[in-house]
C-alpha cells in the first residue's frame, strides 16, 4: 500500500499502476528474504488467481475500474518486464527511478508505459496492449524437426513481438517471435525446448 500512496493514477481505469506494482512488492519482499527462486515461485503461483475476465484497464471517463486481475496479472506483468531487462540490478534501478519520476504524483498508465519503454530502449506498447487491454495470454508455439525449430506467438494481438528466454536442451537462448513463423537451426538434433517460466505465457509444441 506504501507504493500506491506514493504513486497513483488520476483515473480509476488505470488503477493497475497502483495495484500491480504494489502486488509486485510482495515478490520483491519474498526474493529479499528467501532468495530469487522463492520469489519467482511466489509470483508464478499467483497466476492461478488470474481470471482473464476483462481487460485490466477500464473505460475512461465513467469512473470504471478494470478487472480485478490488476493485482496478480499486473504483478506478473511487472515480473515479465524484469525478465526483459535480463539484469536484476538495472531493473531495480529502474524501479527506483520510477519512484523518483512520479513521486507523490497522480499519473496515467500511458505515462508509466512510456517510462518503461524508455528504460528498456524498446517500444513496449505491444506488451502493454496485450496484458492491459486484452484478456488473451500469448502462447509460444513451437515446431521441432530434427535440428530445426520453428516458432511464433499465437492467441495474441497481431503486433505482439516481445522476446522470450527459452531453454534448448538446457542451454539458454533468446528468441524474438512474432505472429508469423520464424526458424533457427542448431548443429545437433534438439531434444527439449521450453520457455522460462518467469514469462507469463502459454506454451504449445505442435506436431
Where are these regions (language model features)?
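Beta-strand-rich binding/interaction modules
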Residues: 124-125, 140, 144-198
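Hydrophobic alpha-helical and helix-loop surface patches within well-folded domains
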Residues: 1-156, 171
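Short acidic/polar inter-strand loop motif in beta-rich domains
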Residues: 197-207
Amino acid at each position: 500500500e506504501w507504493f500506491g500512496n506514493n504513486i497513483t493514477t488520476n483515473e480509476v481505469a488505470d488503477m493497475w499502476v497502483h495495484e500491480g506494482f504494489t502486488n509486485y512488492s510482495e515478490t520483491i519482499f519474498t526474493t529479499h528474504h528467501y532468495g530469487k527462486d522463492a520469489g519467482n515461485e511466489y509470483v508464478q503461483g499467483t497466476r492461478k488467481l488470474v481470471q482473464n475476465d476483462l481487460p485490466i484497464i477500464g473505460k475512461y471517463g465513467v469512473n470504471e475500474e478494470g478487472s480485478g486481475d490488476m493485482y496478480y496479472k499486473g504483478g506478473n506483468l511487472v515480473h515479465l518486464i524484469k525478465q526483459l531487462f535480463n539484469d536484476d540490478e538495472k531493473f531495480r534501478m529502474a524501479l527506483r527511478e520510477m519512484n523518483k519520476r512520479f513521486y507523490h504524483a497522480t499519473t496515467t498508465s500511458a505515462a508509466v508505459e512510456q517510462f518503461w519503454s524508455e528504460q528498456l530502449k524498446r517500444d513496449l506498447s505491444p506488451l502493454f496492449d496485450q496484458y492491459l487491454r486484452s484478456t488473451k495470454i500469448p502462447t509460444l508455439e513451437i515446431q521441432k524437426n530434427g535440428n530445426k525449430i520453428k516458432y511464433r506467438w499465437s492467441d495474441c494481438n497481431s503486433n505482439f513481438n516481445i522476446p522470450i528466454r527459452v531453454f534448448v536442451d538446457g542451454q539458454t537462448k533468446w528468441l524474438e517471435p512474432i505472429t508469423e513463423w520464424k526458424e533457427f537451426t542448431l548443429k545437433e538434433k534438439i531434444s527439449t525446448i521450453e520457455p522460462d517460466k518467469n514469462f507469463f505465457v502459454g506454451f504449445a509444441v505442435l506436431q
